[in-house]
Amino acid sequence: MNIQKKEVYSFQSEVKQLLHLMIHSLYSNKEIFLRELISNASDAIDKLRFQSISNPELYENDSDFKIQISINKSQGTLIISDNGIGMTRQDVVENLGTIAKSGTKSFIKSLEKKEKNVKNELIGEFGVGFYSSFIVSKKVSVRTRFAGSKSNLGVLWESSGEGEYNITDIKKKTRGTEITLFLKKEEEEFLELWRIEGIVSKYSDHITVPVKIQKYDEKNKIYFWEKINKAKALWTQNKATISEKEYQEFYKHLTNDQNNPLFWSHNHVEGINEYISLLFIPEKAAWDIWNRDNKSGLKLYVKRVYIMDNSQAFLPNYLRFIRGLIDSNNLPLNVSREILQDNSITQNLKKALIKRSLKMLQTLSKKDNEKYQIFWNQFGSVLKEGPAEDSNNLNLIASLLRFTSIQNNSSEQNISLEKYISNMHEKQEKIYYITADSYTSAKNSPHLELFNKKNIDVLLLSDRIDEWMMNYLTEFEGKKFQSISKEDLSLNKLTKENENKKETSTEMIEFLKKVKKTLGDKVKSVRLTYRLTETPCIVLSDSNEMSTQMAKLFSAAGQSVPELKYIFEINPEHKLIQKICKIKENEKFDEWIKLLLDQALFAEKGNLENPHEFIARTNKLILEQ
């Protein structure tokens, strides 16, 4: 080894923390280190295949791709090597000294507080890759050279995982990467051939590159290499020949998820656009699914050649939880992310994959309600972005949505729109719903009093996305949606409002005039209502104006919100209203009316512009009683 230049580096602080957590966490599933290293080696070979399309010289006269594993019991080492793309010195610093993932700091911070079993699961989910070597190793060395570079541009990386690493310039005859693990004394089980073969069979059987292990022929006294995996792309096989276990292990390899997938769909499509898709629905949401920089998307292959990870050209954002791959026969091998965006083939594939994904969810919802509920609890809020993003598939998306309602007596969202419609009253014209900040707030809204009395179900929407979603979800199966906190003629029919108002007494008419004079332009209008049973008054939004919940969303996003003026509705049958109606003293009357408006606004909005004034007025009126 000709050493030319040696430097000492410190790990990025997040790497130090992660290594410390792994080394000292007694990680229970230690064998995954080999899966991670083989997966990295396979990716390196995929990248070389792709780059050599435009630059064949990268092959260096060696196109026999392979991953090799050798054991040296006397030295206590396990060596994993590949003849893939390799790394430059800069690549080594960036890939083996840092973690270039957004949200890493917050992830590690949350990890430190978790219980051991949850911590182990999250470590696997985050995808620690190469760093998992330190779970079983006291020291790790990496020898690598980037394909196409001179032999004297090899790099040696060494570390014990305690805070620093060394990088040395070396000569390396062959391209690719060789990782040597100096195993801890208590991890010597990984020096046994049967153990390594078992791990490869369990996790890496589907790797498209041959994984070979070095063995010794006692009879002929020679070492030889034996292939120990199938080395065939799982997605290219007939799905009738693939076991459930094989799909599950392939999913884990593809995603770094430690859990089995909830459901999957494997399809070979022939015709104008020939492609294979293998789509998975995870059991749990990724830790960073709400991170704007979350790298979602499908793995893209063209004619079995790996092109890129996380291609977002084939699925919209509301389906970002779906994992998997697409292998196209029609896209060009030199396709880039930019070309994908404007490619007609891509657009056709996207339409097909969206349909395929939604149909997969539909199948799951009909085939296994329990599993679909698991899916909904994890990803329902993400799918709710669909109506705003995908008008072409609105009805299909709507059929997949789940809600809770006043008749459900539970906050669990498990009612489909089909089920709601099937339980509608014979003369019920619309699908009623209410949006609120929480389930409890929605469940106890005074707007529900009439519906409880008449046994009419109302959907209770309390996710942050709900109000936004309902702007796009306007009808389903011919039934329009109606917010019960907005003015609507169908609500008037339920209470025979017009008939009741014809019988309004002169005294009550004068009362309304007096209320309007007191409130002035604080409200849009004042009127009586007969849909309240326990509450003296409520406020309603005009049917054409912004709702309360939408105003909250705009405000939370830092956008300007127009002043909301509500319709003030008063229940003439409530004892408090009847008592206030008889008050002759103008100042006292005004105070009571202002208090009632504040109560109604507080019930609607959950806050008041001047809570101190409200408290003072309440205290004053209580003392006067």
Swiss-Prot record:
Pfam families for the chain: HATPase_c_3, HSP90
A GO term, aspect molecular function: ATP binding
Record's GO cellular component terms: cytoplasm
Main location group: cytoplasm
Cell compartments where the protein resides: Cytoplasm
Keyword Cytoplasm on entry: yes
Segments of this protein annotated with the region C: 553-625
Bilayer-crossing regions: none
Disulfide bond residue pairs: none
UniProt key word Transport: no
InterPro entries hit by this protein: HATPase_C_sf, Heat_shock_protein_90_CS, HSP90_C, Hsp90_fam, Hsp90_N, Ribosomal_Su5_D2-typ_SF
CDD domains: HATPase_Hsp90-like
Highest taxon in the source lineage: Bacteria
Gene3D superfamilies: 3.30.230.80, 3.40.50.11260, Heat shock protein 90, C-terminal domain, Histidine kinase-like ATPase, C-terminal domain
Entry keywords, A to Z: ATP-binding, Chaperone, Cytoplasm, Nucleotide-binding, Stress response
Chain spans, region B: 338-552
Record region (A): 1-337
NCBIfam families according to UniProt: PRK05218.1
Oligomeric form and interacting partners: Homodimer.
Recorded family membership: Belongs to the heat shock protein 90 family.
Main function: Molecular chaperone. Has ATPase activity.
Stated name of the protein: Chaperone protein HtpG
